[in-house]
Each structure stands twice: as structure tokens, then as C-alpha cells.
């Protein structure tokens, strides 16, 4: 039997997941397990589970120990967030666009995003085993994908009527996982990764609680959270090295932007926005 190379495996896996994505759109699993939600949350769980298993195959089963979390879980989280966003868009937000057209458009975006995710995971896995020139590019790609996943998750959490406690727990858990997976790519101890991930997770969840009470649109809440997350994760990744003055200026500028967003775009009673 001819050996299938990694690039071909990624193509096959991405296509299979996209086909499954299109297939599950034909079913409503809420009829099996009654859930009082406007969208079907079972589909993203199915897709993310399959993504986790297929990632193991893509990497030729060369995954052991901690990488079952740091490597295999990353595409699963990516697929979950993207498929959940697509599910919500398809069933409601953009229904005027035409459901068939939106499904096909979502499938194309899904394929591209998943393909890039698996390529990134493969580079990170190989760079863990040995030093390769693409290692830095893989880490940069993962950072960008993490920001996209986090923003999608923050937006979905605040744009849906979710009980505050569940919202806080979800934000804490996902932020912890995303930070831990990202910090795994640099050479720090497991204890340092856990502490940094927990600190950032608690900070983001506390900010989530505050913003839940702030009179601002869910889109801007997600933007504020992702800016804070970007600063925190950036500092955590650079903590081993000297952080240049230029980077500190960037982070301070983002913090100023956050305060501007919070005060100028908030809806203050009958007067509305300050702008």
C-alpha cells in the first residue's frame, strides 16, 4: 500500500471535514436531544471530535504525551468555533442571503480555514521533534489563528443569551486552553504555562463579567476582549526576552483604544452614544 504524505493527508482530511460540514447541515439534532436554543450545538461537537481524530491520522500517529492536548486539540477548537459561527449564520443572521448560497460560502471559508489550521499544526509538530526553518512561521500562524478563534468565541458568547455563570466558565476554560496551547510552542516549564494560562484566563473572565454589565454592543465587547487577550498573550510569549520600547508603545496604544471604545461606543441612557 503506497504511503500517503502529510500534505495529501491534510487535503483529504480537510475535504472530508468540509463534506461532513455540508452533510450535517441537512439534520437538526435538536429533535433527538431537545435543546432550547435557536441553533444546533451538536453539529460543532461532532465536527470537532472528527477533526481531533483525523489530526492524529494526519500526523502519522506520531503524537505522544502532552501533544494530545497541545497539538490535536487545536484544530478541534478551531473547527468547533468556525462551525458554530456558520451554524448560527445559516439558521438566522444571514438567512436573507439564501441558505444554499450561505452554506456553500461557509463551506469554502471552512475548507480554507481548516486547511491552514492543519498545515500550522503539522509545522508545529515537526518543529517540536526537530528544528526546522518554518518553525517561526508556524508559531506566527498559530498566533493569528488563535486570535481569530478567540474573537469568534467571544462574539458568539455575547451575541447569544447565555447564563452568566456558563458564559464565565466557558470564557475561562477556552482562554486557558488557547493560552496553554500557544505557550507550549516556546521553551518554558509546564508550571509556568499553567500559571500564565490561568492568570490570563481569570483576567479575561473577570473582564467578561464587567463587560456583561457595560452598555455596549456584543461586537465591541468581543473587540475589547480580543485586544486585551492580544496584549496579555503577546506579553506572555515575550516574557523570556527583552520587550522592546516599540512593542510597549503598541500595547499602551491598544489599551488607550480599549478605553475609547468602552466610553465612546457605550449606550448611555436616552442620550445614546457619546459620538
PLM region spans:
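Juxtamembrane boundary at the C-terminal end of a transmembrane helix
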Residues: 263-275
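Interfacial loop-to-transmembrane junctions
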Residues: 237-257
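Cytoplasmic-side transmembrane-helix entry/capping segments in multi-pass membrane proteins
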Residues: 65-78, 133-142, 191-200, 224, ...
Amino acid at each position: 500500500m503506497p504511503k500517503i504524505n502529510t500534505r495529501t493527508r491534510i487535503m483529504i482530511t480537510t475535504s472530508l471535514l468540509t463534506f461532513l460540514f455540508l452533510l450535517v447541515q441537512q439534520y437538526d439534532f435538536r429533535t433527538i436531544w431537545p435543546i432550547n436554543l435557536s441553533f444546533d450545538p451538536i453539529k460543532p461537537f461532532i465536527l470537532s471530535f472528527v477533526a481531533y481524530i483525523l489530526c492524529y491520522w494526519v500526523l502519522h500517529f506520531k503524537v505522544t504525551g502532552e501533544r494530545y492536548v497541545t497539538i490535536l486539540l487545536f484544530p478541534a477548537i478551531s473547527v468547533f468555533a468556525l462551525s458554530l459561527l456558520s451554524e448560527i449564520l445559516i439558521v438566522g443572521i444571514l438567512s436573507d442571503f439564501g441558505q444554499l448560497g450561505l452554506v456553500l460560502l461557509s463551506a469554502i471559508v471552512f475548507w480554507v480555514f481548516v486547511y491552514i489550521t492543519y498545515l500550522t499544526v503539522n509545522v508545529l509538530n515537526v518543529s517540536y521533534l526537530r528544528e526546522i526553518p518554518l518553525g517561526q512561521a508556524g508559531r506566527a500562524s498559530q498566533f493569528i489563528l488563535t486570535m481569530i478563534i478567540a474573537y469568534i468565541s467571544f462574539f458568539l458568547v455575547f451575541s447569544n443569551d447565555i447564563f452568566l455563570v456558563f458564559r464565565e466558565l466557558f470564557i475561562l476554560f477556552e482562554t486557558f486552553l488557547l493560552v496553554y496551547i500557544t505557550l507550549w510552542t516556546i521553551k518554558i516549564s509546564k508550571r509556568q504555562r499553567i500559571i500564565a494560562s490561568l492568570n490570563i484566563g481569570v483576567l479575561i473572565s473577570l473582564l467578561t463579567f464587567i463587560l456583561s454589565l457595560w452598555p455596549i454592543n456584543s461586537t465591541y465587547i468581543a473587540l475589547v476582549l480580543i485586544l486585551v487577550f492580544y496584549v496579555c498573550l503577546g506579553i506572555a510569549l515575550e516574557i523570556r526576552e527583552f520587550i522592546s520600547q516599540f512593542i510597549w508603545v503598541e500595547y499602551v496604544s491598544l489599551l488607550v483604544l480599549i478605553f475609547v471604545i468602552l466610553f465612546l461606543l457605550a449606550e448611555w441612557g436616552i442620550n445614546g452614544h457619546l459620538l
